[in-house]
Regions:
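Phosphate- and other anionic-substrate recognition elements at nucleic-acid/protein interfaces
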Residues: 1-131
Length: 131
């Protein structure tokens, strides 16, 4: 019996902007469904910005019938405070699909780039062209 198509949401966590994209994976074929950005109000308190990410992504997962989530792994920044804040945002981003019952997997940016472009150190223009 052939595998059924799977609807996957990809998430690129950030406190200011969290990018998301939904695809359908059907064997070796991928089909774009939707994409967007969640931008919490920058003037809101930190905890409210995290809540905004969590709630918005929960709605997006439900609206698009997602079954699995792929989250980009975090890299360590030069600024420890920024890295810690990104870690908080990443936690909210990972919890939203988990609460919705999705399987959540983590992938390194280089692995994602290699899968899309064929090279692990591709730039954003190369990725956009391939998508």
């Amino acid at each position: 019996m052939a595998n059924e198509p799977v609807r996957i949401i990809g998430l690129d966590p950030g406190l200011r902007r969290t990018g998301w994209g939904v695809i359908v994976s059907d064997g070796a074929r991928l089909r774009w469904v939707a994409h967007g950005v969640v931008s919490p109000p920058e003037s809101a308190p930190f905890s409210e910005r995290l809540l905004h990410l969590f709630e918005a992504l929960g709605v997006i997962c439900a609206d698009h019938g997602c079954e699995e989530a792929a989250v980009e792994e975090v890299f360590v920044n030069v600024n420890p405070s920024s890295t810690l804040k990104l870690g908080h945002a990443r936690a909210a981003v990972m919890l939203a699909p988990a609460k919705a019952g999705l399987t959540v997997a983590e992938y390194s940016p280089n692995l994602i780039k290699k899968a899309v472009v064929g090279a692990g150190h591709a730039d954003k223009c190369q990725i956009a062209f391939m998508v």
